[in-house]
């Protein structure tokens, strides 16, 4: 079995190998991760642990890979993914978990001692074991839901039947209605259906409505024509020359408006010109000479800044050369010390090895033979091989009975050896294919004998090999090679990366230093570069401001030169006279437009009167048509009255049918209630049987737990007589759930488990854990500090009992103090 951990609690990356079907002790100092290994196996198989945080610190995810026989299991957290490969098939997530439960059992998933649980929690725990293959709770819920549905349906049916019975007292058979007479209908409508009669009525109503609408429209048009003639009399005659007068006035107004707009624009331009003239006087002190002087001052500051920067770079280069020389001397001294120290280590290892300086290949060969022999023996179970040899040898004997004395004998079919029939068991069989079976058994027996010889040879090799001494000597050989390699690497001095980079920088700047020293003397600076740059910034700002002022002055001079003469000679009196003349023309134009509106109104009314007269002529109104339609409508109403009586007669027939259907539905509801009541009684009986079956399964589980506890506790408590612990299932009345109570008989007294000592309590808890692990079918048994409170002798007896109880399972035990000899393998962290 191979376990690989990545970012799981205290393990960033680790791999552990465990032998199958054997017992492994995991020991080591506290905090080294012993319990984490068991937790990782539980996480890989079942995905649930009692720990909330399983991811390593400052990591975002973890991964556990478990290889067990044909299984390859990988479970990750963030993302939560389970992947299982078994016999060439791949399974994932829920499907993979089902496969793991089938082959590795289920886990109790309970971090609390069984006796510390409440009655409800104990029952839930035992129910999970008893009902592992079937969800009894879901079945009971379905039965309960079905009973609730039946009760609700019965209540609904009872209500319906009661309501129907009450309604039956009020619902009476309808009174008979005579069939209507068709002869009362007009002969032209007698053969028509109700829809046809209604269609005739709609057509008649539409025609009558059209005649009424035509009459109303004729009256409305007459009234509108009278109103128009009255308005024309009030407006009087129309003036046809008003249009020419309006055109003349509009031309005058347009000319005066253009003149007024031009004068207003000249006025605004005159105000802007005066403002620009006043602003121009502010730039009298700005000139080209002043700008040139500022430019020369900025160039002087630039030259001073360049000289200061070059001087600072030269000083910095001198400081770096001094630092490089000091670092070179320091690193050479450290290199000599490390070389001397490595030579001392090599001499010390040579002294420990002694005269045999070249025996490394022989030591490696002997260690390899030892570990190969140990691995071969751990992979083969010696008791199982012996038992198989005994069984094969027993199968080689065939029973023969003497026909004269009836004496039973056994004949070895391979060697023809004869022995008494009472010596040992008879496992041979007769029938077809016996010869082939005997050949296979002889061949298998030879293989087992060869395998036993190899195992005995390996035991002899392991006994004659001092593995600890050889391992220590092999480590010395390896340390010697490591030190020699380190000395070979340190033969030549290599400067550090920072020193090499500093020397490269100095070599790169040598040409710059020579050129700078030839032009500038290396003297202290009178003024810093920052101060010079601040002065330059101030001078540049003043230069930019002066350039902006000079540009603004030129712009104002150009703008003043482009103003027209009308702006220069603008007159306020001429502007006011033009506005007064425009106001007079606008008033006259408004009066003429009112006169034009009156003329248009007269023309519009005359056109409307002519249109109304045309509509009256087209209407062609005739009052006799309305009387004819009224007479036709009365005949149609008589026919519709006949059809109304027909509808009433049909309603009577429908009510009679409903009355008959009501009584039929009442009889059907009573029949359905009888059938549903029978189904309800059957379901109640089934629910009672489910509860009884569940109780019997719990009794069976408790009996199995008691039998396992009895066997374990007799070995865990050798000084106790009788059964130390027994679980009894007590039932309350039918409407409550059964409860579990535990009684402890220890040394002839009935006591509470909390009054036991720490060691006694640990043994009781271990017995419960092993019992549930065996019942749940766990393939890998994991025990974490289960004997921490027990002495060495009792711990040894308990571990021997555990090993004998689970001979064909992989057992992982975490313990600080235990006899390592009783375990097949020991893993020290």
From Swiss-Prot:
It holds the Pfam family SMC_N. Gene3D superfamilies: P-loop containing nucleotide triphosphate hydrolases. InterPro entries: P-loop_NTPase, RecF/RecN/SMC_N. Transmembrane segments: none annotated. Belongs to the IIV-6 050L family. This is Uncharacterized protein 094L. It comes from Invertebrate iridescent virus 3. The lineage of its organism: Viruses, Varidnaviria, Bamfordvirae, Nucleocytoviricota, Megaviricetes.
